[in-house]
């Protein structure tokens, strides 16, 4: 038997993205966004409302970064989602974040979050709240790379959002090799 929840944005896992952009004053701002994902091999889409300071900064600068929220930074990542940059102009610093300018786009990288997509603005629709960015570069700190130079999710420790229970969770163990395990059924 199934339980119906009606039309709700319930999806597992939901990534926790931290979007960051420079303000016109050169001060970085960021926000937590859980409704987003890869749109195609060079684009990412995120749902953010027009009223956010970060949205205004992205529209002004035409660039942004999307960092993966991590278990190590869950408090700071939640803080930037529940605090408005319009009311707390230094919320980036209050979260304990430090910024380094991206080499690829005019946007800040968050030093404390070790993986980010560096994006140029493609479009924004204030009616649907859909922000689309072209992925110019993905950067990852050496601390989360394995011996082959690939991102190790166990070292990154990304968190996901559970919309049903309003909690953050970490990802679990490796289950099988993708595009391989299904061959057992051929």
What do these predicted regions represent?
Residues 1-186:
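Basic, polyanion-binding surface patches
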């Amino acid at each position: 038997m199934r339980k119906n929840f009606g039309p709700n944005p319930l999806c597992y896992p939901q990534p926790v993205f931290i979007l960051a952009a420079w303000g016109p004053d050169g001060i970085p701002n960021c926000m937590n966004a859980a409704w987003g994902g890869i749109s195609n091999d060079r684009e990412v889409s995120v749902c953010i409302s027009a009223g956010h300071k970060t949205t205004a900064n992205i529209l002004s600068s035409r660039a942004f970064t999307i960092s993966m929220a991590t278990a190590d930074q869950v408090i700071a990542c939640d803080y930037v989602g529940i605090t408005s940059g319009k009311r707390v102009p230094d919320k980036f610093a209050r979260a304990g974040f430090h910024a380094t300018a991206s080499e690829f786009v005019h946007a800040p990288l968050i030093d404390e979050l070790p993986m980010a997509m560096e994006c140029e603005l493609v479009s924004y629709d204030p009616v649907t709240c859909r922000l689309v960015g072209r992925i110019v570069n993905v950067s990852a700190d050496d601390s989360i790379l394995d011996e082959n130079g690939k991102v190790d999710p166990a070292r990154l420790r990304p968190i996901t959002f559970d919309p049903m229970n309003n909690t953050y969770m970490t990802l679990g163990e490796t289950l099988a090799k993708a595009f391989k395990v299904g061959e057992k059924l051929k």
